[in-house]
A protein has these predicted regions:
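Tubulin/FtsZ superfamily GTPase core signature
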Residues: 1-243
Length: 243
């Protein structure tokens, strides 16, 4: 939520208690009849049914949106099952639909891994572009020993930063502007995408940031084979033309 003032946020869930604890003012409980507000029980079919049940409300939520970002974790019931349905409905309303999803840690079990794989296949067919963040790729030395809840929070922060980067490209005027049409030309029908982020400080901050982004553990694909790329560079007032 932090730093996302330029976009409207909507939290969806099949679990009423979990939704109640979500720090987002706009919320929607889906699958009220199907799940009775008790969650999807790690069953993607239940999550899919919940989204279909809320079809009218979801279409209304997508009304007049130019671009819709869908975020969630694959592997469970609600996210895995509902995201492909919501992506399809968003596209029906003409919105550019970008899904940013996390894949489960390998130690979360074979069932969640299998669910995530099947859910990703469906999502690829529904969304314009799917940005995949494998949680296992986040297991760097500096977070390996974190408590599990903090490790999940770290994954959520990466996901949030990815959204903020893309919204900044079109919603905040820069020295080199990229408008919505530019983004659509790259992301419309873009398939699966990866994201890399880097920061730099000191005398070599520009090159350090580029190297960090290009060697990000989140980049599993060879970028030389990419059909397109969105690049967002942010710096202070002292950033030079050479940088």
């Amino acid at each position: 939520k932090e730093g996302m003032n330029s976009i409207e946020l909507l939290a969806l869930n099949t679990d009423a208690q979990h939704l109640l604890n979500t720090p987002i003012p706009h919320r929607m409980l889906i699958g009220k009849q199907l799940t009775k507000g008790l969650g999807a029980g790690s069953e993607p079919g239940t999550g899919e049914g919940a989204a279909e049940e809320a079809r009218v409300e979801l279409l209304e939520a997508c009304q007049d949106a130019d671009i819709i970002f869908l975020t969630g974790g694959l592997g469970g019931g609600t996210g895995t099952g509902s995201l492909p349905v919501i992506a399809r409905l968003a596209k029906e309303k003409g919105a550019l639909t970008i899904a940013i999803v996390t894949l489960p840690f390998s130690n979360e079990g074979a069932r969640r891994t299998r669910n995530a794989r099947l859910g990703l296949e469906k999502l690829r067919k529904s969304a314009d572009t799917v940005i995949v963040i494998p949680n296992d790729k986040l297991l760097q030395d500096d977070i390996m020993n974190l408590p599990l809840n903090l490790a999940f929070r770290h994954a959520d922060e990466i996901l949030g930063n990815a959204i903020k980067c893309m919204t900044e490209i079109t919603s905040h005027g820069g020295l080199v502007n990229i408008d919505f049409a530019d983004m659509r030309s790259i992301m419309d029908g873009g398939g699966v995408a990866m994201i890399g982020m880097g920061e730099g400080q000191g005398a070599n901050r520009a090159s350090d940031a580029v190297i960090a982004a290009l060697t990000s553990p989140l980049l599993e694909l060879d970028i030389a084979e990419s059909k397109g790329a969105l690049v967002n560079v942010t710096g202070g007032d002292d950033m030079t033309l050479q940088e």
